[in-house]
Each structure stands twice: as C-alpha cells, then as structure tokens.
C-alpha cells in the first residue's frame, strides 16, 4: 500500500481532558448513581472530533468551562449501554464546528459534548447542574477498532 493511500485511510481523533477537581466531581456523581461499572476517572474525556478523514488540527491552548446538564443512557455501537454526562459548552461546540469546516468529518447529525461515566450500565435519565473544566486538548490517529479493543 502506498503511503498516500495509508494516510487517506487514517482518521483524526481530538479529545480534551478534565481538570482534577472536575474528575472528582464526576466520581461523586458515579457514586451517587451507584454505577456497577464506573469508568476510571483517568479515562474521563470529551470527544471534540472523531473524523474518519485525516486533517491537520490547529493547536489551541484553552480551557473550556462546561455545564453538565443531564445524565443519560445511550445504546452503544456494540449493543450495550453507556451512562453519559451530557454537557452544554458553546465554545466547545464552536471548536468542533471549526474542525469540521477545515475538512473533519462527523458520523452523527448532531455533536453532543459528553463524558462517559460507565459502560454496560443502565440508568433513568436525570437533569443535574454541575460545572466542569475541560483542559489539555490532545490529538491522535483515529482508532477505528476502538469498540473491539475496549470490550
């Protein structure tokens, strides 16, 4: 396979981590919800872009302040469930849209910023109001085998 074809087959993943205080806030939420399979707080992140097309991502050094507004339960690609903390953060949505405008792709009709709290758990959705800080954006090649590797 030529290098150009290989690069065309690779995508781009952009994520952002939570600061320590925000991680601890979400750990308290996990405990309150009595989740059976809580995700390790060191794995907490928000996906900014999951693009099946490789793009050059302009680096930003910023902190986003987001409000967790709802805890929800989503069906995953492998048919299981994930408990997610859905958040409102207009600046993060703008960052996502900027990356789409320079050639990134997105598999879903809408971008919903969220942090996964647990896999293979089911809860009743509920509204909450918790502020979190998103720091340390990172970029890596898109892992199209992510579901298979995290089973």
Curated annotation (Swiss-Prot):
Function: Counteracts the host CBASS antiviral defense system. Phosphodiesterase that enables metal-independent hydrolysis of the host cyclic di- and trinucleotide CBASS signals such as 3'3'-cGAMP, 3'3'cUA, and 3'3'3'-cAAA. Does not cleave cGG or cA4. Besides evasion of the CBASS system, might also enable evasion of the type III CRISPR systems that use cA3 signals.
Annotated residues for binding of 3',3'-cGAMP: 13, 108, 140, 146
GO biological process: symbiont-mediated suppression of host innate immune response
Annotated TM spans: none
Organism: Vibrio phage KVP40 (isolate Vibrio parahaemolyticus/Japan/Matsuzaki/1991)
Pfam family, one: Acb1
Protein name: Anti-CBASS protein Acb1
Keywords from the UniProt entry: Host-virus interaction, Hydrolase, Inhibition of host innate immune response by virus, Viral immunoevasion
GO molecular function terms noted in the UniProt entry: hydrolase activity
Entry similarity comment: Belongs to the anti-CBASS protein Acb1 family.
Binding site for 3',3'-cUAMP: 13, 108, 140, 146
Reactions the enzyme catalyzes: 3',3'-cUAMP + H2O = U[3'-5']pAp[3'] + H(+); 3',3',3'-c-tri-AMP + H2O = A[3'-5']pA[3'-5']pAp[3'] + H(+); 3',3',3'-cAAG + H2O = G[3'-5']pA[3'-5']pAp[3'] + H(+); 3',3',3'-cAAG + H2O = A[3'-5']pG[3'-5']pAp[3'] + H(+)
Active site: 45, 47, 114, 116
């Amino acid at each position: 396979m030529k290098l150009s074809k290989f690069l065309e087959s690779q995508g781009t993943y952009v994520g952002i981590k939570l600061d320590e205080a925000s991680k601890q806030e979400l750990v308290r939420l996990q405990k309150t919800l009595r989740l059976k399979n809580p995700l390790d707080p060191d794995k907490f992140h928000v996906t900014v872009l999951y693009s099946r097309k490789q793009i050059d991502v302009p680096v930003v050094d910023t902190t986003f302040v987001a409000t967790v507004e709802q805890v929800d339960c989503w069906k995953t690609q492998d048919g299981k469930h994930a408990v997610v903390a859905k958040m409102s953060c207009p600046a993060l949505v703008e960052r996502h849209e900027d990356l789409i405008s320079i050639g990134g792709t997105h598999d879903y009709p809408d971008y919903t910023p969220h942090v996964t709290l647990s896999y293979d758990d089911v809860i009743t959705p509920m509204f909450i109001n918790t502020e979190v800080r998103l720091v340390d954006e990172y970029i890596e090649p898109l892992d199209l085998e992510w579901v298979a590797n995290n089973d």
